[in-house]
């Protein structure tokens, strides 16, 4: 981040950076090893372990709209602290689970915590950040997330080698720490929807037809994005016959974002057609995934992963910056929460249908099938966003966050 932008960044946003980094460190240190714990130490099937992860994701994304409406009504700071505290309890509970239902309770609590602090946190970033530097602020948050991913691999490996018990307590303690830090140092962020009931946000979002279409189109983007959690690791293992290389390929994506995200935002600063940029990013992601069908060496896998990461770096800052442009300031968290359905649906379809189509292609000796589908999805996303771009200005809320 440039020094002048850093100077313009409010102290409260810098504190949000700290809490975001700590939470990402805790999340990515625990979740990948939860699957290994369930299938290894506990002896569950992969399908059963996947069900626990699916319950956690649905508990978060499925209730994020409600969490956003609560944040708009009762304040962003208090909602964030409540969500962080609930997730801290959920993550710590994994250390004490001995029966199946214990794990599902811990997963639900973990997800519900996220459904509160995620939309409230995104709205806090948008409200506290001057409009002129909001894209850069969200881009730097994306960088910190990937720094957290890389750091969590080191921390998670070290603690998991001791015992999953300590890893769960560590992850829970990190979220508890962020709750305390936010309580002590984050300034009050007043509720923006003080004159209307919670359900006014519900009605307002559902009547915003352009935003609903935008959210639906983003399902395709997240279908592509979530390939990093299933089909890409599986392809790397199938080609290299060693799980170690999975970490190398995924780290290529994270390190690329860390090194290049801010520079790409700077290069695209003068390009004002934001929806088209999101579409171009999705198209680049689709191309990177499509090229995987030609990869037969580690360096080709890493090159395709780098191309894929370029697409995420083009799209992601624009995606998180678009929501406050649609939303009236009194409903911004509700808009963020509803927009999360694109991730919930796209991620679920990606992991279920994407995994199935990968197996079908493999069994029919049509390895090109899942990757060609990804290219087509990228084309559909860019075409729809290109058509929507011309109508964007008249759809932006006149009372949006400035």
Each predicted region: which residue ranges?
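Juxtamembrane intracellular "pre-TM" segments in multi-pass secondary transporters
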Residues: 1-10, 187-217
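Short amphipathic helix-loop junctions that connect adjacent transmembrane helices
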Residues: 32-47, 230-245
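Residue-level signature of mid-helix packing/kink "hotspots" within the transmembrane helices
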Residues: 57-65, 149-150, 254-262, 347-348
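Conserved MFS/SLC helix-loop-helix module at the cytosolic interface between two early adjacent transmembrane helices
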Residues: 61-98
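Helix-to-loop junctions at the C-terminal end of transmembrane segments
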Residues: 64-75, 260-273, 358
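Cytoplasmic helix-loop-helix junction between adjacent transmembrane helices
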Residues: 107-145
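A membrane-interface helix-boundary motif in multi-pass transporters
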Residues: 160-173, 356-377
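A late C-terminal transmembrane helix in Major Facilitator Superfamily
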Residues: 331-362
């Amino acid at each position: 981040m440039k020094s002048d932008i850093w100077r313009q960044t409010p102290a409260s946003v810098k504190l949000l950076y700290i809490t975001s980094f700590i939470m990402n460190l805790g999340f990515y240190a625990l979740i990948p090893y939860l699957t290994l714990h369930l299938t290894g130490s506990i002896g569950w099937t992969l399908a059963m372990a996947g069900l626990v992860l699916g319950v956690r994701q649905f508990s978060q994304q499925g209730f994020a709209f409600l969490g956003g409406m609560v944040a708009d009504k009762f304040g962003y700071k208090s909602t964030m602290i409540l969500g962080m505290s609930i997730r801290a309890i959920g993550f710590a509970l994994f250390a004490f689970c001995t029966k199946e239902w214990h794990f599902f309770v811990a997963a639900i609590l973990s997800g519900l915590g996220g459904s509160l602090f995620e939309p409230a946190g995104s709205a806090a970033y948008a409200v506290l950040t001057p409009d002129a530097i909001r894209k850069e602020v969200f881009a730097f948050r994306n960088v910190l997330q990937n720094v957290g991913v890389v750091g969590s691999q080191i921390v998670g490996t070290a603690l998991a080698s001791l015992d999953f018990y300590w890893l769960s307590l560590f992850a829970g303690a990190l979220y508890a720490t962020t709750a305390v830090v936010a309580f002590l140092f984050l300034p009050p962020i007043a509720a923006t929807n003080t004159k209307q009931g919670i359900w006014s946000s519900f009605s307002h979002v559902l009547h915003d037809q352009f935003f609903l279409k935008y959210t639906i189109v983003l399902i395709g983007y997240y279908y592509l994005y979530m390939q990093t959690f299933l089909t890409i690791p599986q392809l790397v293992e199938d080609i290299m016959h060693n799980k170690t290389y999975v970490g190398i390929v995924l780290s290529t994506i994270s390190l690329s974002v860390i090194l290049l995200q801010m520079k790409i935002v700077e290069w695209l600063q003068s390009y004002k057609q934001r929806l088209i940029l999101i579409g171009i990013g999705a198209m680049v992601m689709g191309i990177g995934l499509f090229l995987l069908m030609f990869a037969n060496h580690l360096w080709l896998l890493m090159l395709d992963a780098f191309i894929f990461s370029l697409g995420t770096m083009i799209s992601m800052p624009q995606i998180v910056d678009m929501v406050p442009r649609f939303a009236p300031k009194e409903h911004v968290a509700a808009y963020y929460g509803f927009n999360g359905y694109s991730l919930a649906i796209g991620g679920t379809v990606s992991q279920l249908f994407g995994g199935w189509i990968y197996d079908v292609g493999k069994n029919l000796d049509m390895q090109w099938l899942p990757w060609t589908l990804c290219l087509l999805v990228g084309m559909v996303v860019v075409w729809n966003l290109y058509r929507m771009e011309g109508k964007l200005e008249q759809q932006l809320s006149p009372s949006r966050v400035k």
